[in-house]
Amino acid sequence: MAYLSECRLRLEKGFILDGVAVSTAARAYGRSRPKLWSAIPPYNAQQDYHARSYFQSHVVPPLLRKTDQDHGGTGRDGWIVDYIHIFGQGQRYLNRRNWAGTGHSLQQVTGHDHYNADLKPIDGFNGRFGYRRNTPALRQSTSVFGEVTHFPLF
């Protein structure tokens, strides 16, 4: 099995891995009106790392103070949707599942590290070394150009 460091394992275990629970909660809230919660968090431009320089320019902060939006801003749908996304029933359900460690799977966490953990040798139709050994002459001598590998040939 692939080795994972404790820090990396802890970080990846904290990530939401249970897609079934997220899908079920999102489907249930998708039928309700008004749409207050979704699995995708609402976008807040003032908290976006890539838009930080725009909001720190010399023109924008006075405008934000004038419109009373200089306290971190809200998402497109307003503060109620932001509040319900953080403290609503759907998010509380997902938070409780993740705090308890539900939905954590070692195969999902190890990801690509787990892919080559237990390889078995593959012997194809032409043997261990592939197509270069499929004629009697090549089975007797390796190549007229010499060997280019340090692995055993026969």
Swiss-Prot record:
Protein name, UniProt field? Sperm microtubule associated protein 1
Which Pfam families does the UniProt entry name for this protein? SPMAP1-like (PF15075)
Organism domain of life: Eukaryota
Annotated InterPro entries? SPMAP1
Tell me the name of the encoding gene: SPMAP1
